[in-house]
C-alpha cells in the first residue's frame, strides 16, 4: 500500500508540473475578469488549494469572503473545463452555484459566463435571482420549471 501511495503522489506531482502553470494562468485570468480586476494572480497547488495575490501578499482562499471563495472555485472548475476541453463543445452545468453571491457579483458572473462561448449553459436554481439578473441584462434564456 505504501508503494502504491508513493506512485500516486509521484504521478500527482508530475501531472501538476505539466498542467499546473497553464491552470494557474487560466484561473488567474478568470478571477481577474470575475472580480473586475480586484485579484490578479492565483496559485493552485498540487492538492488544488488556492492562494490569491492581494497585491501585498498571498492569502489562503479560506481567509477570503465566502463570495470571493465561491468565485475562485468557479474559476478553478471552469479553467479545468477550458484546459481539458479546449474546443468548448461541452455543456457547463451549475446547480445552485451562486447562492453566496450578492446581486452585483451574480450579474457580473452571469455576464462573464455568457461571454465565454460555451456551447450550452445549464443553470439549476431554486431562486429567481438568476432569472431576474438575466432579464435586467437583456440576456435570452429558456426557463424549464421542475416539479
Regions found by a protein language model. Name each.
Residues 7, 36-55, 90-93:
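Long, charged, glycine-rich C-terminal linkers/tails
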Residues 104-147:
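C-terminal lobe/lid and adjacent interdomain/linker elements of RecA-like ASCE P-loop ATPase modules
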Residues 1-35:
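Charged, surface-exposed helical/loop "interaction arms" that form contiguous linear patches used
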Residues 13-24, 50-78, 97-104:
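Conserved ABC ATPase signature
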Residues 1, 31, 72, 95, ...:
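Hydrophobic, well-ordered secondary-structure elements that form the walls
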Residues 31, 65-67, 85:
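ABC transporter NBD signature
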Residues 87-100:
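Substrate-binding beta-hairpin/strand module that engages nucleic acids
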Residues 70, 88-90, 117-122:
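Loop/turn-to-beta-strand initiation segments
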Amino acid at each position: 500500500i505504501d508503494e502504491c501511495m508513493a506512485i500516486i503522489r509521484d504521478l500527482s506531482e508530475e501531472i501538476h508540473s505539466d498542467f499546473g502553470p497553464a491552470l494557474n494562468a487560466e484561473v488567474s485570468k478568470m478571477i481577474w475578469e470575475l472580480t473586475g480586476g480586484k485579484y490578479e494572480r492565483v496559485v493552485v497547488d498540487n492538492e488544488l488549494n488556492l492562494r490569491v495575490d492581494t497585491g501585498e501578499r498571498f492569502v489562503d482562499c479560506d481567509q477570503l469572503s465566502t463570495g470571493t471563495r465561491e468565485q475562485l472555485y468557479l474559476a478553478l472548475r471552469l479553467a479545468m473545463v477550458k484546459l481539458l476541453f479546449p474546443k468548448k463543445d461541452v455543456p457547463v452545468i451549475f446547480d445552485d452555484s451562486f447562492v453566496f453571491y450578492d446581486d452585483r457579483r451574480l450579474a457580473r458572473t452571469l455576464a462573464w459566463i455568457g461571454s465565454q462561448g460555451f456551447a450550452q449553459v445549464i443553470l439549476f436554481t431554486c431562486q429567481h435571482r438568476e432569472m431576474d439578473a438575466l432579464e435586467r441584462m437583456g440576456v435570452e434564456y429558456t426557463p424549464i420549471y421542475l416539479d
